[in-house]
A protein has these predicted regions:
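Vicinal oxygen chelate
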Residues: 1-2, 83-127
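N-terminal beta-strand motif that seeds the catalytic metal site of vicinal oxygen chelate
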Residues: 1-19, 68-71, 124-127
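Core segments of cupin and vicinal oxygen chelate
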Residues: 13-52
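Helix N-cap motif at beta-to-alpha junctions
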Residues: 17-18, 75-79
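Hydrophobic side chains in well-ordered alpha-helices
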Residues: 21-24, 81-85
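Short beta-strand micro-motifs in enzyme catalytic cores
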Residues: 42-44, 69, 107-111
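Short glycine/serine/proline-enriched coil/turn segments at secondary-structure junctions
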Residues: 62-64, 103-104
Length: 127
């Protein structure tokens, strides 16, 4: 797996109020790197140096500690990585295929596994 990874891509934080979340992180020095609507969810990627936060409004946020939804690892050759992870039998797959979203300039492809503490680890490739 290590040969496919290039670093942390983003940390996903759901929100009930995306504007309030953006204002908070802007006060910390973050800038809006990308903003869009995906279905009914508003999505914003907020950047501070090499740290990227993906926040998305879903109106189901529990508003309690442990609010981070997932950690995304930046990868290359996602289809090959997916096959390797699935065939290993070591990991609990949360996705049965590589998915796509129309984010950024050319979209992204991703899939998610479950960590030993029920954390979600997303492997994501910007296209």
């Amino acid at each position: 797996i290590k040969g496919f990874t290039t670093g942390v891509q983003h940390i996903g934080i759901p929100t009930n109020d995306i504007n309030k979340t953006i204002e908070f992180y802007e006060a910390l020095g973050f800038n809006i790197a990308y903003r869009t609507v995906n279905g009914a969810e508003e999505v914003a990627f907020l950047q501070l140096h090499n740290l990227m936060i993906e926040t998305y409004q879903n109106y189901q946020t529990k508003m309690e500690y442990g609010a981070i939804d997932h950690i995304a690892i930046d990868v290359k050759n996602i289809e090959d990585l997916f096959d390797e992870v699935k065939e290993s039998g070591i990991f609990t797959m949360l996705d049965n295929q590589v998915k796509g979203l129309p984010f950024w300039e050319n979209g992204v492809k991703f899939f998610t596994i479950e960590g030993p503490n029920k954390e979600k680890i997303e492997f994501c490739e910007k296209l």
